[in-house]
């Protein structure tokens, strides 16, 4: 069984994760354009939940397509 996760960069598609990567993650942080564009969002697959830096928000989940882009409607 392989997991389906959304992956950035655009276009954001759900892709099959490589074997051994059984988590989807969403990572968000502010860059220089945060006030006009909002947070940067990175999506992908992981074997273990990525460690969170002080300025990041990181969430992980383990079901298919459980990490949609916050601004994207789930399909």
From Swiss-Prot:
The keyword tRNA-binding does not apply. Its main location: secreted. Expressed by the venom gland. Coiled coil: none annotated. Keywords: Acetylcholine receptor inhibiting toxin, Disulfide bond, Ion channel impairing toxin, Neurotoxin, Postsynaptic neurotoxin, Secreted, Signal, Toxin. Pfam families: Toxin_cobra-type. Binds to muscular and neuronal nicotinic acetylcholine receptor (nAChR) and inhibits acetylcholine from binding to the receptor, thereby impairing neuromuscular and neuronal transmission. Blocks muscle type nAChR. Also binds with high affinity to alpha-7/CHRNA7 nAChRs. In addition, shows a weak inhibition of neuronal alpha-3-beta-2/CHRNA3-CHRNB2 nAChR. Selectively binds to alpha-1-delta subunit interface of the mouse muscle nicotinic acetylcholine receptor, with a 10-fold higher affinity for the adult than for the fetal receptors. Belongs to the three-finger toxin family. Long-chain subfamily. Type II alpha-neurotoxin sub-subfamily. This is Alpha-elapitoxin-Bc2c.
């Amino acid at each position: 069984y392989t997991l389906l996760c959304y992956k950035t960069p655009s276009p954001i598609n759900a892709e099959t994760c490589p074997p051994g990567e059984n988590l989807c993650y969403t990572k968000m942080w502010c860059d220089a354009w945060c006030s006009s564009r909002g947070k940067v969002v990175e999506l992908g697959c992981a074997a273990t939940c990525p460690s969170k830096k002080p300025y990041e928000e990181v969430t992980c989940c383990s079901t298919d397509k459980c990490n949609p882009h916050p601004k994207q409607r789930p399909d």
